[in-house]
Amino acid sequence: MQSYYGERIKMTELDRGSFGSKIGLILATAGGAVGLGNVWRFPYMAGQEGGAAFILVYIGCVLLLGIPCMISEFIIGRHGASNTARAYTKLSKGKAWKWVGYLEVLTGFLITGYYAVVSGWCLQYVYASIMGELHGDPTFVAEYFKEFSADPIRPVMWTVVIFLICHFVIIHGVRGGIEKASKIMMPVLFILLLIIVVAACLLPNAGKGVEFLLKPDFSKVDNGVFLGALGQSFYSLSIGMGCICTYASYFSRQTNLFKTALQISVIDFMVAILAGLMIFPAAFSVGVSPDSGPSLIFITLPNVFNEAFAAVPVLGRAISLLFYVLLSLAALT
């Protein structure tokens, strides 16, 4: 069985290709996990659900369920060496399991339906930051988002741009496209995160934001917190969406699956924590109550940047630009 498995992997590597380096494999697969949920959902949940207490529950969910499920998808993807639907079919002679693969494909398709649109919004806000269109009072910023999201042309245009960028990367294959792009975008994402975290933590009253995120409050831990942490761990690691299984189809037989899953989980967690240290110190420095979702990203934070850096408007525009470039990279990877 081992001989058959090894020969099969070797054969599919020659036919299908594989990642050219370990760092490229890690960054590309981690990029598939890291996304907008790390920025607009995890930090808010952590702050509202007990701070460090929620984070500990989340880590437990990742270790006990997230990583084992990721390894399972790695095994299925690497052995199947095909798209997600066919990978499940190859592993089982029965017909029932093939529908699991199709469900993962359907899940990814449904997520793409809104994810591509929101990713396009991020690109629009990169443009708006460059042109200074987000500089104004809170009412203006809220109306700007409302007007843009209701526009029948611009959101579609930016969504098309997102698909064209993805298409350009994908047509160059694994090594020349996805791996090469991830080697550039993921380090840049971390650099931008660190720059904005430092800028946010130097603001007055930034410590209150750090406390909101990290101070443990075990009195808030209940069944809802466990359920929320479990759901966030699966969503953040892209479990059950076909993404992880597809990336694993390009893994070589030398790839240590446990080590890879652990490294990806650590990177994903680091991005989520840094996102919280970026958002909440800035929000609390101007007395803004943080929220989650699109309103946090496209209404609350532009106002926070405007007010926090009101003394130096150019700096506020620069931080806003860096933030939306960061978001665009997180969405694209």
Please state what every model-predicted region is.
Residues 24, 51-58, 95-113, 179-189, ...:
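Alpha-helical transmembrane segments and their helix-start/interface "positive-inside/aromatic belt" motifs
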Residues 21-61, 208, 242-248, 259-262, ...:
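Transmembrane helix-boundary motif of multi-pass solute transporters/channels
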Residues 37, 62-74, 78, 84-86, ...:
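Central hydrophobic cores of alpha-helical transmembrane segments in multi-pass inner-membrane proteins
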Residues 58-66, 105-130, 158-172, 187-200, ...:
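Hydrophobic core segments of alpha-helical transmembrane domains in multi-pass membrane transport
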Residues 12-19, 179, 183-332:
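Membrane-embedded translocation segments of transport machinery
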Residues 9, 13-18, 44-49, 79-103, ...:
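Inter-helical loop and helix-membrane interface segments of multi-pass membrane transporters/permeases
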Residues 31-37, 77-79, 111-117, 233-240, ...:
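Short helix-coil transition sites and intra-membrane helix breaks within transmembrane domains
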Residues 2-40, 67-74, 78-91, 95-102, ...:
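Membrane-interface "cap" regions at the ends of multi-pass membrane proteins
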